[in-house]
UniProtKB/Swiss-Prot annotation:
Recorded GO MF terms: nucleic acid binding; protein methyltransferase activity; S-adenosylmethionine-dependent methyltransferase activity
Class of this enzyme: transferase
Ligand binding (S-adenosyl-L-methionine): 30-34, 51, 86
Protein name: Putative protein N5-glutamine methyltransferase AF_1784
GO terms for biological process, alphabetical: methylation
Species lineage: Archaea, Methanobacteriati, Methanobacteriota, Archaeoglobi, Archaeoglobales
Role of this protein: Putative protein methyltransferase using S-adenosyl-L-methionine as the methyl donor. May methylate a Gln residue in target proteins.
Catalysis performed (reactions): L-glutaminyl-[protein] + S-adenosyl-L-methionine = N(5)-methyl-L-glutaminyl-[protein] + S-adenosyl-L-homocysteine + H(+)
Binding locations of substrate: 86-89
Family that this chain belongs to: Belongs to the eukaryotic/archaeal PrmC-related family.
Organism: Archaeoglobus fulgidus (strain ATCC 49558 / DSM 4304 / JCM 9628 / NBRC 100126 / VC-16)
Keywords: Methyltransferase, S-adenosyl-L-methionine, Transferase
CDD domains: AdoMet_MTases
Ranges in a coiled coil: none
Length: 177
């Protein structure tokens, strides 16, 4: 009932490792299995993980990661220099729904952007001044994720790509000037 690491997880890790600085205070939103956070631990000042799933939260704790069970980063008052998120970015069709926590980990809502919008709307609250975020998105998302980023006054740069059979995944670095 936890999202298992896949190509998108690897893409986030690669982009995070290129961006990471030793003095970064990092939050990984929706950390799931802890694949990324586990590999960043010890390479930065601190790392906090969040996940909405109690099963993911238990797994993150089991791996020795600091975790807050919450939706995105609700209730967290600290701001972070590096924010990471591999969101659910696909629209899960009704016949594929299982009615469990894995649905929450995979289903990005209509056109795959519901959770991405929620994340972008909360980014000012969790990203420090001169902070950066790395977001994973799909070429299948509508409206275009780049437009959603622009509409919220952020700047962005594609810092990684991965072509799959039916879509292209992007690692997008986001910041404010």
């Amino acid at each position: 009932m936890i999202y298992e690491p896949a190509e998108d997880s690897e893409l986030l890790l690669e982009a995070a490792l290129r961006e990471l600085k030793p003095d970064d205070e990092v939050i990984e939103v929706g950390a799931g299995s802890g694949f990324v956070a586990e590999r960043l631990k010890g390479k930065c000042k601190c790392i906090l993980t969040t996940d909405i799933s109690p099963f993911a939260a238990m797994e993150l704790r089991r791996k020795g990661l600091d975790v807050v069970m919450t939706d995105i980063a609700k209730g967290i008052r600290k701001k972070f220099s590096l924010v990471l998120f591999n969101p659910p970015y696909v629209e899960l069709e009704d016949e594929l729904r299982r009615g469990d926590w894995l649905d929450v980990a995979i289903d990005g809502g209509k056109k795959g952007v519901k959770v991405i919008k929620k994340f972008l709307d909360s980014l000012d609250e969790i990203m420090a001044e001169r902070g950066r975020a790395i977001l994973i998105a799909s070429s299948q998302n509508e409206p275009d994720v780049f437009d959603l980023i622009d509409e919220r006054g952020f700047r962005y740069e594609i810092v990684g790509e991965r072509g799959l059979f039916f879509e292209k995944l992007f690692a997008i670095k986001i910041w404010k000037e």
